[in-house]
Every structure is written in structure tokens, then in C-alpha cells.
């Protein structure tokens, strides 16, 4: 029997980012209970030896499955370790892969309170509005002028620990240049 290949998009990430993602997911599943409907599958519960974990996020009738991998073929650079993540949207027998931004938007649609566009009308009418968006990574566009004014008026506090963001998990850190802080100009010219 011949080999059957299946091609899928796997976002290359480092091991520590996957570890942080898994611990944030578990924290919000079991401690804060904001993601209590999510399901975490360990590596030993999978038939595929390359899968290190799976997070199943119900979205109505569909679900989002974020799968992390280990032991993959390394990338073009030495620090491209063999870890990755795939993001899949499933509904019954239909499956498709999506990008991290869309995954964050879908999570935002179904979970976590938001200071939404409707808050503008509610605030004008004198009704109580949700004070802040709990999941700002789910927004990918700039809001209206009124929305921006209200969101700057109501400052959001940084959440500890932060909510798990798929965009942050799959962020491309490999091809970004290193940024140094507090080094103005050439260090040779500064006398160091």
C-alpha cells in the first residue's frame, strides 16, 4: 500500500510558548472558570506520536481545535526547534484550517465579556455598559471614533494571568530582528 500524504499548515513556535499556552488554558479552565467548556487532551490520549496536546473549544455547533506538535523536522535555522501548532475549525464531518487572527475572533464571539459597539448606544441612553473588553486580541480592526473615545475613557487593566491568545501562540518571532533597549547610537561612539 502506498503512503498517503496529508498537507496541513503548522505554525512554527518555540517550546516555551506552547508551555505558556497550555498553562494559561488550564488556568482559565479550572481556576478562573472562564473557559470551563473547553476540553484539554494530553499527548498520551492521542494516537499520533507527534501531537503534544489538543485544546477543543466549542463554538456553538462547531468547535475549534488547537493542536500542538513536537518532534517535527526542524526549520532552516538552528533555533527553529521541532515544535508547532495547527488551528482547525470543525463542524460535523467538515474541517478547515484557519489562521490565528480568525481563531481569536471566533473565541471572542463565544467567550469573554466585551465592551462592544453596542456600548456606545447604551452609554448615550444612560444604561449600564460592560466596563472593558476581556479579550482585546479578538479585535482586528479599529473601531468607530465614538468607540475609541469610550475605550480610552475606560482604561482596561492588564489581566493576570492573561487570557490565552491563539495569535500570540502562533506569533512569528523567528524572522523578526532583535530589538535592543536603551542603546542609542553606536556603542563604540558612546565610550563603552
Swiss-Prot record:
Q: Where is this motif: BC-box-like motif?
A: 144-153
- Residues of the region (Interaction with host APOBEC3G) are 40-44
Region listing for Interaction with host APOBEC3F and APOBEC3G, in residue ranges: 54-72
Region annotation (Interaction with host APOBEC3F) maps to: 14-17, 74-79
Could you tell me which residues belong to the region RNA-binding? 75-114
Residues recorded with modification Phosphothreonine:
96
According to the record, the residues making up region (Membrane association) are: 171-172
**Where do the segments described as Disordered lie?**
158-192
Q: Which UniProt keywords apply?
A: AIDS, Host cell membrane, Host cytoplasm, Host membrane, Host-virus interaction, Membrane, Metal-binding, Phosphoprotein, RNA-binding, Ubl conjugation, Ubl conjugation pathway, Virion, Zinc
Region of interest: Multimerization = 151-164
Where on the chain is Phosphoserine found, per UniProt? Answer: 144, 165
How this chain sits in the membrane, per its record, is: Peripheral membrane protein
Biological process (GO) annotations held by this record are: viral life cycle
Q: What is this protein called?
A: Virion infectivity factor
| UniProt organism field | Simian immunodeficiency virus (isolate MB66)
Gene name of the record: vif
Amino acid at each position: 500500500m502506498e503512503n498517503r500524504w496529508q498537507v496541513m499548515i503548522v505554525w512554527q513556535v518555540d517550546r516555551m510558548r506552547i508551555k505558556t499556552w497550555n498553562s494559561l488554558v488550564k488556568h482559565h479552565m479550572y481556576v478562573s472558570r472562564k473557559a470551563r467548556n473547553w476540553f484539554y487532551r494530553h499527548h498520551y490520549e492521542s494516537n499520533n506520536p507527534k501531537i503534544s496536546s489538543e485544546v477543543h473549544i466549542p463554538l456553538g455547533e462547531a468547535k475549534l481545535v488547537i493542536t500542538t506538535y513536537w518532534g517535527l523536522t526542524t526549520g532552516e535555522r538552528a533555533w527553529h526547534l521541532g515544535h508547532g501548532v495547527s488551528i482547525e475549525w470543525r463542524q460535523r464531518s467538515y474541517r478547515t484550517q484557519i489562521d490565528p487572527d480568525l481563531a481569536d475572533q471566533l473565541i471572542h464571539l463565544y467567550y469573554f465579556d466585551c465592551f462592544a459597539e453596542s456600548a456606545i448606544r447604551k452609554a448615550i441612553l444612560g444604561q449600564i455598559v460592560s466596563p472593558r473588553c476581556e479579550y482585546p486580541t479578538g479585535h482586528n480592526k479599529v473601531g468607530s471614533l465614538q468607540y475609541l473615545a469610550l475605550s480610552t475613557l475606560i482604561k482596561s487593566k492588564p489581566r493576570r494571568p492573561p487570557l490565552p491568545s491563539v495569535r500570540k501562540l502562533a506569533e512569528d518571532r523567528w524572522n523578526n530582528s532583535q530589538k535592543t533597549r536603551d542603546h542609542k547610537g553606536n556603542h563604540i561612539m558612546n565610550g563603552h
